Swiss-Prot record:
It is found in: Cell inner membrane. It comes from Chlamydia pneumoniae. One of its GO terms (biological process) is positive regulation of translation. Belongs to the TRAFAC class translation factor GTPase superfamily. Classic translation factor GTPase family. LepA subfamily. One of its GO terms (molecular function) is GTP binding. The keyword Acetylation does not apply. Required for accurate and efficient protein synthesis under certain stress conditions. May act as a fidelity factor of the translation reaction, by catalyzing a one-codon backward translocation of tRNAs on improperly translocated ribosomes. Back-translocation proceeds from a post-translocation (POST) complex to a pre-translocation (PRE) complex, thus giving elongation factor G a second chance to translocate the tRNAs correctly. Binds to ribosomes in a GTP-dependent manner. It catalyses: GTP + H2O = GDP + phosphate + H(+). Residues 7-188 form the tr-type G domain. Its main location: membrane. This is Elongation factor 4. GTP binds at D19, H20, G21, K22, S23, T24, N135, K136, I137, D138. It is a peripheral membrane protein.
Length: 602
């Protein structure tokens, strides 16, 4: 790989809300810099998963190195693409830490949206040079003057020289490249000679093993070096090869130098060994201090995943193991359920992360699976002072020994057109939200700041927000603190037998309505038996809702033609005794559709 003067290197990222054209602009930049040959070009080149293309989102960060001749000088432009969704905000923050600048892409028709706002604030915290770009200016609904004013008023960026572009037609792309070179500062010349490299991602390749994506801050990294991860402490690894993204990961000779972005492979066994945000240094001459900002990624949302056919358990285990190779944030623990059999308790960064894993298992491994209702981590403080972290209703202790329960809360920003304000306030009130402030984004739109329990967000908040705002509302959230809450375990009993798959942890105020809706749904989906089946929702053995599935009645007197009524009475009495015995010893078979229908309530 050609060596570049550090002042000719530009590391930048692209910040955009879902569907504002981030991947398409990346495509145009690759075309304009001749990084990709025309015959290899396709839409959303950096989005390698089918799921990313279909949903129009970036799930996994994809770096790429471009070379560009500008005013007689050759520049190396490193685009460190980032996932846009709030679930992956820590990965976004680490990717932004590897950059000196960012393009803020805003749809010229839709304007500023919640997730682009959240990521802009992350970039501002890291003192990045932000270049505002208005995309889709070829749309009839585009209003560049109003949207530019919105960016200036709410984000505080100077939009005097805002770039208007259309990724579809290629208009404005040369202006973006010029702005990257002129406005994004080059990497700072290192003050020390020891190797310091920021890990901003990792990828498992079936042929070469784990590839660690790094941005070199100081020192040099080359094949044969022995390196250590400073946060992991302990193990030393030999670098077996280094490479760059041209745009595909390509092995190179020589070394990775300060300011450059690339990857290395070493004798690493598991993705878990590589932590995003960690600092790589040499084992013999280590850096004195690691780079700032590292933290462990912990799952926020938990759900059980079970195969519909129990014989698929080993296939599901293999599928989750393979997905975990490329996703260190996914946690897996084997568990068993009385009603669903053997499965796994999985931890995710958020609801989108859960949906993506669920969909990939179905698509890539052709498995039929059930996911239990998503849950969060509650802190249960016992009377003896011990604190338990509970993410599964089955682990909830006896209420008699509980002092109190604390639940996680989040800070939420909602952007909405003005006319839907009352709808959103009613929705947030129903979700136990606390309004912090309301601000005007422009003449037509508002920004609402709320505090909400995380449990209310992970169920159906996004769907309901889209519903009450006719699709125009958007939101992002960040984790806040734990607060005391009246959280209780709701049990569902079928024929007086508790069914663990339907149990859930809910707020006391919502327990009755939740219990009633589960009972009503089960009455519709469980087939009738020859005996009466009671369906009950209970809290601490006290029934709060009940429905009954009526028995199938067989006409036992069909063969009696007229005659004495006592003969009929004997047959009815015999039937009654049989049904009583059946109720005591009969088993209710619950179809898989019942589990799926109840989970749809979430």
């Amino acid at each position: 790989m050609k060596e570049y003067k550090i002042e000719n290197i530009r590391n930048f990222s692209i910040i955009a809300h879902i569907d504002h054209g981030k991947s398409t602009i990346a495509d145009r930049l690759l075309e304009s810099t001749s990084t990709v040959e025309e015959r290899e070009m396709r839409e959303q080149l950096l989005d390698s998963m089918d799921l990313e293309r279909e949903r129009g989102i970036t799930i996994k960060a994809h770096p790429v190195t471009m070379t560009y001749l500008y005013e007689g000088e050759v520049y190396q432009l490193n685009l460190i693409d980032t996932p846009g969704h709030v679930d992956f905000s820590y990965e976004v923050s680490r990717s932004l830490s590897a950059c000196e600048g960012a393009l803020l892409i805003v749809d010229a028709a839709q304007g500023v949206q919640a997730q682009s706002l959240a990521n802009v604030y992350l970039a501002l915290e890291r003192d990045l040079e932000i270049i505002p770009v208005l995309n889709k200016i070829d749309l009839p609904a585009a209003d560049p003057v109003r949207i530019a004013q919105q960016i200036e008023d709410y984000i505080g960026l100077d939009t005097t020289n805002i770039i208007a572009c259309s990724a579809k037609t290629g208009q404005g792309i040369p202006a973006i490249l010029k702005a990257i070179i002129d406005l994004v500062p080059p990497p700072k010349a290192p003050a020390e000679t020891e190797l310091k490299a920021l890990v901003f991602d990792s990828h498992y390749d079936p042929y070469v093993g784990i590839m660690v994506y790094v941005r070199i801050i100081s020192g040099e990294l080359k094949k044969g070096d022995r390196i250590t991860f400073m946060a992991a402490k302990g193990s030393s690894f030999e670098v077996l090869g280094i490479g760059a993204f041209l745009p595909k990961a390509t092995f190179i000779e020589g070394s990775l130098r300060p300011g450059q972005v690339g990857f290395f492979i070493a004798n690493l066994k598991k993705v878990k060994d590589v932590k995003i945000g960690d600092t790589v240094t040499k084992t013999k001459h280590p850096a004195k201090t690691p780079l700032e900002g590292f933290k462990e990624i912990n799952p926020v949302v938990f759900a059980g995943i079970y195969p519909i056919d129990s014989s698929d358990f080993d296939t599901l285990k293999d599928a989750l193991g393979r997905l975990q190779l490329n996703d260190s944030a996914l946690t897996i623990e084997q568990e068993s359920s009385h009603s669903l059999g053997f499965g796994f308790r999985c931890g995710f960064l958020g609801l989108l992360h859960l949906e993506i894993i669920f969909e990939r298992i179905i698509r890539e491994f052709d498995l039929d699976i059930i996911a239990t209702a998503p849950s969060v981590i509650y802190k249960v403080v016992l009377k003896n002072g011990k604190v338990l972290d509970i993410d599964n209703p089955s682990g909830y202790p006896d209420p008699a020994i509980i002092e109190h329960v604390e639940e996680p809360w989040v800070h939420v920003n909602i952007i909405t057109p003005q006319e839907y304000l009352s709808n959103i306030m009613n929705l947030c009130l129903d979700k136990r939200g606390i309004c912090v402030k309301t601000e005007m984004l422009d003449q037509h739109r508002l920004v609402l700041a709320y505090e909400l329990p995380l449990n209310e967000i992970v169920s159906d908040f996004n769907d309901k927000l889209k519903s009450v705002t006719k699709g125009y509302g958007s939101f992002d959230y960040r984790l806040g603190d734990y607060r005391k809450g009246s959280i209780i375990k709701l049990e569902v009993l079928i024929n007086e037998e508790p069914i663990d798959a339907f149990s859930c942890l809910v707020h006391r105020d919502k327990a009755e309505s939740r219990g009633r809706s589960i009972c009503e749904k089960l009455v519709d989906v469980i087939p009738q038996q020859l005996f009466k089946i009671p369906i009950q929702a209970a809290i601490n053995k006290k029934v709060i809702a009940r429905e009954t599935i009526r028995a199938l009645s067989k006409n036992v007197t069909a063969k009696c033609y007229g005659g004495d009524i006592t003969r009929k009475r004997k047959l009815w009495e015999k039937q009654k005794k049989g049904k009583k015995r059946m109720k005591e010893f009969g088993k209710v078979s619950i179809p898989n559709t019942a589990f799926i229908e109840v989970l749809k309530l979430d």
